[in-house]
C-alpha cells in the first residue's frame, strides 16, 4: 500500500489550501514541508521517497519524522536572516516537544522571516485534537503574528513584517471540493 493511500484523509484536508500554499511557496526562498503526505499533488507522479532527497527542486526539505521541520527552519532563519522561509505542519505536531520548543525560540529570537502554516483539521489518532491543542496555541501569542484563516484566499492573510507569522488554516479532514478541483496557476 502506498504512503499516499495511508494518509488520504490528511492529504484531503490540505487540498483546498493548494492555491494559497502555492502562493506562499512561490514567495519563499526556502520551503519545508513537515506534512509531506498532505502535498502529493506537488510531487512528480513517480516520486516515492519523501525525505532529505532534493530531487524536487522547489521543496527544500520534507520529513516523515514529524516535528523536525520547524526546528530546521529556525536554523535556516538564523543563518540567512534575509531569506523567507515557509513551513507547513499538521496540527498534531503542535503537541510535539521539539515543535513547541522551536515556536518559543523563534518568537523569542523574533525570526520574522518565517511563515508557518498549520493544517488545523482538529483530528488525531486519539480523537478530537482541540481538547488538548487549544492551550498549545497560546504559545504563539506573546511573539508571533497569528492569522486564523477559513477562506483559503491569499489576499485574506494579513502578515506582520516585524514578527514571525503563523497561519492557522481551519480545515476538515476528508472534506474538500470536487475531485476535479483545479490549482490556479
What label would you give each PLM region?
Residues 2-109:
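Cofactor-binding active-site loop characterized by glycine-rich and histidine/acidic residues
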Residues 1, 12, 17-21, 31-33, ...:
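Generic low-polarity alpha-helical segments
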Residues 59-185:
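Glycine-rich ThDP/TPP pyrophosphate-binding loop and its adjacent helix/strand module
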Amino acid at each position: 500500500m502506498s504512503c499516499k493511500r495511508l494518509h488520504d484523509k490528511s492529504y484531503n484536508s490540505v487540498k483546498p489550501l493548494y492555491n494559497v500554499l502555492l502562493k506562499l511557496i512561490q514567495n519563499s526562498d526556502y520551503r519545508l514541508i513537515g506534512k509531506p503526505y498532505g502535498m502529493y499533488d506537488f510531487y512528480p507522479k513517480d516520486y516515492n521517497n519523501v525525505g532529505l532527497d532534493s530531487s524536487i527542486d522547489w521543496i527544500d526539505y520534507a520529513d516523515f519524522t514529524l516535528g523536525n521541520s520547524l526546528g530546521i527552519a529556525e536554523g535556516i532563519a538564523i543563518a540567512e536572516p534575509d531569506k523567507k522561509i515557509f513551513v507547513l505542519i499538521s496540527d498534531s505536531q503542535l503537541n510535539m516537544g521539539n515543535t513547541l520548543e522551536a515556536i518559543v525560540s523563534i518568537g523569542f529570537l523574533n525570526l520574522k522571516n518565517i511563515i508557518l502554516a498549520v493544517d488545523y483539521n482538529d483530528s488525531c489518532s486519539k480523537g478530537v485534537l482541540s481538547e488538548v491543542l487549544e492551550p498549545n496555541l497560546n504559545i504563539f501569542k506573546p511573539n508571533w503574528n497569528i492569522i486564523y484563516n477559513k477562506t483559503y484566499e491569499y489576499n485574506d492573510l494579513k502578515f506582520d513584517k516585524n514578527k514571525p507569522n503563523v497561519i492557522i488554516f481551519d480545515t476538515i479532514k476528508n472534506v474538500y471540493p470536487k475531485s476535479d478541483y483545479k490549482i490556479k496557476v
